[in-house]
Amino acid sequence: MAIGLIGRKVGMTRIFTEDGVSIPVTVIEVEANRVTQVKTLENDGYRALQVTTGAKKAHRVTKPEAGHFAKAGVEAGRGLWEMRLGEGEGEGIEVGAELNVEIFADVQKVDVTGQSKGKGFQGGVKRWNFRTQDMTHGNSLSHRANGSIGQNQTPGRVFKGKKMSGHMGAERVTTQNLDVVRVDVERNLLLVKGAVPGATNGDLIIKPAVKA
């Protein structure tokens, strides 16, 4: 897998092309990603880069975290993220190095991963796009009810994964093949066409698109 970066969703706006066409874009702030660990086949069984970004107040850094960041010689960040590396990727990157948005200068499309907005407990109509039942014709209580959830004595159970009411959202979601509209190295900004998962200020993982 290609090297990606950790960013923060700033919000949405629009930009205009020379032809006057309006393009909706999401602004992603990509601060310097500091390499905290380089995992190798010999030591860890797989190749990966572990990075952090941002800052965390000193009193919120646990002792294990403090030791890990101190060993890498980098400032404590707001989290740790790991990105798998393919054969030949990440060569020459050492612990303590900084990666910035400039690595996307020649990238046309990206995949963006984030945590979707939580919607709480929702019914089948909202959560799974179930059809509603009749509003009239003798139906007075079951307009938005899910309906049958199984068969009879055989199999005598409800199958795992059955679409039912429950907690909606707050899941890891990836939006693929978003066009890179602009890379602003001076302000550490990446502008991508369209929407990305999650709420404003949410953390995002941006990687070159796998299906591009």
From Swiss-Prot:
Family, similarity comment: Belongs to the universal ribosomal protein uL3 family.
Role: One of the primary rRNA binding proteins, it binds directly near the 3'-end of the 23S rRNA, where it nucleates assembly of the 50S subunit.
Domain of life: Bacteria
Upper classification of the organism: Bacteria, Pseudomonadati, Pseudomonadota, Gammaproteobacteria, Alteromonadales
Entry's Gene Ontology BP terms: translation
Subunit structure, interactors included: Part of the 50S ribosomal subunit. Forms a cluster with proteins L14 and L19.
GO MF assignments: rRNA binding; structural constituent of ribosome
Name the record gives this protein: Large ribosomal subunit protein uL3
Organism name: Shewanella amazonensis (strain ATCC BAA-1098 / SB2B)
Cited PANTHER family: 50S RIBOSOMAL PROTEIN L3 (PTHR11229), LARGE RIBOSOMAL SUBUNIT PROTEIN UL3C (PTHR11229:SF16)
